[in-house]
Amino acid sequence: MTAEPSSAPPEQPILRRIALSLQYEGSDFCGWQRQNNARSVQAVLETAIAQLDPLRPIQSFAAGRTDAGVHAAAQVVHFDCSGPIPAAKWAPALNGRLPASIRVRESVERPRDWHACYSAVYRRYRYIIHNGRRPNLFLTPWTWHRYHHRLNEENMRVALEGMIGLHDFAAFMRAGSRRPHSRTTIQDVLVEREGDLIRVEIQASGFLYGMVRLLMAQLVAVGEHRLSVKAFEQRWRDRRRDQVREAAPARGLCLLRAGYAEPIFSEAGWYDCQPWFSLATDDPPPDPPCFAKDEQQELQ
């Protein structure tokens, strides 16, 4: 007697969610997000993942959608996989298939309801200005060389500290944004000089399209005394996008890290991911307190 063929649907593979801590040198890419006829970090990464898990379409999600030319020291990415590769083995396996300009520092497994973008409570960006008289070839790929005269970093710090809190930053949002509003919460800022290098860091629940580079150009105007601290504040409080035209170069900007309600990767990795021009005594900034749910939705 021949058994009746089963009409039950085939079993679906059990999917696991893998989180990656990712570094990339952004000069050769059109940004994180996949684009037609351009080389993106997302497309290159997904091609490498598909070589290791070829049985299903691969889609990855990132904590921050960096623009063309912007670097990342510890971008956080997740994807779902169906294969048997242990979570910790994804990092070396991918590094063997990725170009030298993209490195996976660590790979861990996360619950299926965890999301690299929507679970993040903050992102922290760093911008480096080279304020020396002469250009330096070895600093050029990572900094904005700007010297009309010595920048006043104290004025820059005061201007930036006035932005802390939940505000409407429409003045610093480029055209083409898909966000329904221009509000976000700036949680922490830092302006520090070491020799000819000025380091600016901004931590926020989320960033508007083009926000940091537009803001940095205005902040440098404050440092050069072309714009007063009061005029800077009035400009963004009045949401005067027509007065904010110049954007700082992408090469000076780096996505430093994204933060979550609980640690995702090893703390030792924080020190490994620091760009070489950072201060050697850096410590990881403390995690911010739990913010209200509506503030956590101010995501890029």
From Swiss-Prot:
Substrate binds at Y125. Its EC number is 5.4.99.12. Keywords: Isomerase, tRNA processing. One of its GO terms (molecular function) is tRNA pseudouridine(38-40) synthase activity. The keyword tRNA processing applies. One of its GO terms (biological process) is tRNA pseudouridine synthesis. It is an enzyme of class 5 (isomerase). It catalyses: uridine(38/39/40) in tRNA = pseudouridine(38/39/40) in tRNA. The keyword tRNA-binding does not apply. The active site is at D67. CDD domains: PseudoU_synth_EcTruA. NCBIfam families: hisT_truA. Belongs to the tRNA pseudouridine synthase TruA family. Homodimer. Formation of pseudouridine at positions 38, 39 and 40 in the anticodon stem and loop of transfer RNAs. PANTHER family: PSEUDOURIDYLATE SYNTHASE (PTHR11142), TRNA PSEUDOURIDINE SYNTHASE-LIKE 1 (PTHR11142:SF0). This is tRNA pseudouridine synthase A. It comes from Synechococcus sp. (strain CC9902). The lineage of its organism: Bacteria, Bacillati, Cyanobacteriota, Cyanophyceae, Synechococcales. The gene is truA.
